[in-house]
């Protein structure tokens, strides 16, 4: 457990309601996260011309199930992007978009193991519409720990990123969050924080859901890179944004 270097009784009361993990307690979550990314990389390397989005979703589902990571309540999602405009005929009818060499793809899944749920997303090759959003999300991801060390609040940093929305809260790794867990705009107290980000340019959006650890070693993310969840506008038709669960 982390020792609080503060005489603030309110902060101590907050900490009594939450379990603060040691260095090994997060290993199961990180293992599930690594497995999720490994699975998406394998499926991306297996894409073949003629495969539909549904075919690819079934492949991801089967891979997760074979590794005991599948949760029926969290089905994988696949989207093929940047498909050239052409007359729909036969197998190219609406709802049956098929992969062709050079198309972009967005693969999403959740790996669930022993109560730990880790999100993963993989996009490629070169989905240019999302590159700027990815870069800005990565900038925020990299700058937040340094901003917290300087004494800035998360909202002060977010104000420098137009179009960014964020939600964060103290969170245990498993179990139901108690009432009163949301914290205002004051300094973050020690603990494990769940962070959700959404960044939009009006047409496309990207988001992430990840964990920030605050302890006597300073603020730091559990993973080096953001886990992006993506939403694109395909062929001029806006799709409903898929937010982090």
Regions found by a protein language model. Give the residues of each.
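Active-site neighborhoods and metal-handling regions in enzymes and metal-associated proteins
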Residues: 1-245
């Amino acid at each position: 457990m982390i020792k609080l270097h503060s005489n603030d009784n309110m902060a101590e009361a907050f900490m009594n309601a939450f379990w603060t993990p040691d260095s090994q307690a997060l290993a199961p979550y990180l293992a599930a996260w690594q497995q999720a990314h490994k699975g998406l990389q394998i499926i991306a390397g297996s894409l073949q011309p003629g495969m539909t989005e549904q075919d690819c979703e079934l492949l991801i589902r089967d891979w997760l199930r074979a590794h005991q990571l599948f949760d029926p309540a969290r089905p994988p999602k696949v989207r093929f992007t940047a498909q050239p405009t052409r007359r729909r005929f036969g197998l190219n009818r609406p709802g049956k978009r098929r992969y062709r060499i050079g198309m972009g793809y967005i693969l999403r899944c959740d790996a669930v193991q022993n109560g730990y749920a880790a999100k993963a997303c993989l996009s490629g090759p070169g989905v240019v519409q999302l590159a700027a959003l990815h870069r800005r999300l990565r900038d925020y991801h990299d700058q937040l720990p340094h901003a917290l060390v300087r004494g800035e609040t998360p909202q002060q940093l977010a104000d420098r990123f137009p179009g960014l929305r964020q939600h964060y809260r103290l969170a245990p790794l498993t179990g139901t969050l108690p009432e009163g867990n949301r914290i205002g705009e004051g300094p973050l107290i020690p603990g494990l924080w769940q962070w959700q980000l959404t960044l939009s340019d009006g047409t496309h959006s990207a988001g992430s859901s990840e964990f920030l650890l605050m302890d006597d070693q300073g603020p730091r993310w559990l993973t080096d890179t953001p886990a992006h969840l993506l939403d694109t506008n395909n062929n001029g038709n806006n799709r409903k944004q898929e937010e982090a669960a």
